[in-house]
Amino acid sequence: MALLILLFLLPSPLHSQHTCSISKVTSLLEVNCENKKLTALPADLPADTGILHLGENQLGTFSTASLVHFTHLTYLYLDRCELTSLQTNGKLIKLENLDLSHNNLKSLPSLGWALPALTTLDVSFNKLGSLSPGVLDGLSQLQELYLQNNDLKSLPPGLLLPTTKLKKLNLANNKLRELPSGLLDGLEDLDTLYLQRNWLRTIPKGFFGTLLLPFVFLHANSWYCDCEILYFRHWLQENANNVYLWKQGVDVKDTTPNVASVRCANLDNAPVYSYPGKGCPTSSGDTDYDDYDDIPDVPATRTEVKFSTNTKVHTTHWSLLAAAPSTSQDSQMISLPPTHKPTKKQSTFIHTQSPGFTTLPETMESNPTFYSLKLNTVLIPSPTTLEPTSTQATPEPNIQPMLTTSTLTTPEHSTTPVPTTTILTTPEHSTIPVPTTAILTTPKPSTIPVPTTATLTTLEPSTTPVPTTATLTTPEPSTTLVPTTATLTTPEHSTTPVPTTATLTTPEHSTTPVPTTATLTTPEPSTTLTNLVSTISPVLTTTLTTPESTPIETILEQFFTTELTLLPTLESTTTIIPEQNSFLNLPEVALVSSDTSESSPFLNSDFCCFLPLGFYVLGLLWLLFASVVLILLLTWTWHVTPHSLDMEQSAALATSTHTTSLEVQRARQVTMPRAWLLFLQGSLPTFRSSLFLWVRPNGRVGPLVAGRRPSALSQGRGQDLLGTVGIRYSGHSL
């Protein structure tokens, strides 16, 4: 009997219960088999399982082939299952989350083929010593990778190249000593990087690239601060608000930045970002970023002109205009140097003294000032008589001129030097330091056959002035400064010295000015004025003043480069023209602007000054006109308004003859004489009032108390005059 009772109490095999709990989470079926002491996958799992928990069991090994028939499986948790190996011989096409944490895995197989849709992979707290280079191949959808708390000592190059959508990378608590330089290449979506608690000593140059990492954890490493850490130091300085100190159980978004947590292990835990880097090279190879603050100063360069006394031809090219045609065979260069500030230099000259000439000091100061201006100016002062027996001042061979604008050809037996002139100084009978770097040379008669592209004009001695295209002032004899780029030719037996660009030689007793635009004058052996003007006027501005006993300073703005050879160079471009026994005084120089500026009155400075004044006067006139109009309008309105008011009052009186307003006092009787209403030609006006009957609380109506009576007109005939009758209670109204 007892045995029958025991058999009845035993559970029937037909009614076996499930070992795992099943629940529905959203649209996925969740099966929880945690801590069931399982050694293999349960056989009674639902086929539509979407979330499977197998943690805290003793599985040992696991193969993805056992889950192939679970086509809806999306989340798989295998944490704390004492796994030592993982086999990926089955394809789980929908699996997105795989948790393999807290196991004994020492290696990982390739996961790309078996898990193509994987987005989160957690292999933390295992015993991984290394990773194969292709372990993540095929995981193009991976967004989170957790590898913390392993034994990783190094990472293969290109490990993360397949995972271009990676957002979180956790490599904390490993034994990493170094990182591959291109580890983060292509990870544009990466926002959180955990590298704390490793054995890192430095970060390779360019490791972070152009990534904007909002959350980075770098503390508790063996950072060694030397010259190799300068890149990492600069990155910390630039991203100080993105470096955090990790705290267990605290979300990264709840922590505060702490860049000082990254410390140097060899400098008493000093912050890496404050490492001074003394003695380290500062070459561009030390940094992998663009430093826009350290802009090196560009050294200013100056254009130098060299020319020689041999028979070769040299050509000068203006930087802003085309050079004149010439037969030059030398190389040509065009240079635009920057504008220089005024400089003061000294040049030493060796001079010889001739009888009757004023002695110049050996040391002369030159203050050339260069500015960026464009001018079309021709300087034409009066001619100056120059004897052919002048004394040459020979400069020493280490001074370079800054300007030259001529092309000069000298045959072998010629003694004509090539001076360049831009500044003219004519002090009177005294020894004055003159700003100069050029020399006036009185050549001997020579024959210089040189082809030229300018117009050749032969002028006989005369006193007839030739028309010019600029304002010409002919004061007392002086020296002419004419820039030119034409080729100079002096005929045979000429007694006229050959000037270049700015020196004009005029024989005695010649008063004939020479045209100053595109004209080359070649005199015969006579006392005729010789002048050279380029066929192409260079853009030049020259300001020339001649105070007594004061050097004349000329401000020039023209940049060009000329290649010449074998002649001592000059620093400035000034010509000193002596006269026998005295210096000629230059009282006046005509400064002629271009024809365009003369013909246009709007370019005149006086006109520009009067233009605002004119607009101001017009504005005042307009204001005055508007005020007068306003005054007239107000005056007209003042006269018109009274008439309008009279008309309105008349209309009101006409209307009032047919309207009467009566005020009746509230009393028992109102006496109204009929004579008051005789002027009304019609029926009597009707009155309408309201009568309120007050009802006492006891229900009685009336009699009416004092102060609550109907109007006087309603007594006796009130039934015809009353409009509406309202009934009110003592307490409230209906």
UniProtKB/Swiss-Prot annotation:
PANTHER family per the UniProt record, alphabetical: IG(IMMUNOGLOBULIN) AND LRR(LEUCINE RICH REPEAT) DOMAINS, PLATELET GLYCOPROTEIN IB ALPHA CHAIN-LIKE-RELATED
Region of interest (Disordered), residue spans: 406-429, 460-526
Site for Cleavage, residues: E588, V589
Side of membrane Cytoplasmic, spans: 634-734
Role noted for this protein: GP-Ib, a surface membrane protein of platelets, participates in the formation of platelet plugs by binding to the A1 domain of vWF, which is already bound to the subendothelium.
Gene Ontology biological-process annotations: blood coagulation; blood coagulation, intrinsic pathway; cell adhesion; cell morphogenesis; fibrinolysis; hemostasis; megakaryocyte development; positive regulation of platelet activation
Spans through the membrane: 613-633
Phosphoserine, modified sites: S711, S714
UniProt topology in membrane: Single-pass type I membrane protein
Protein name: Platelet glycoprotein Ib alpha chain
Residues exposed to the Extracellular side: 17-612
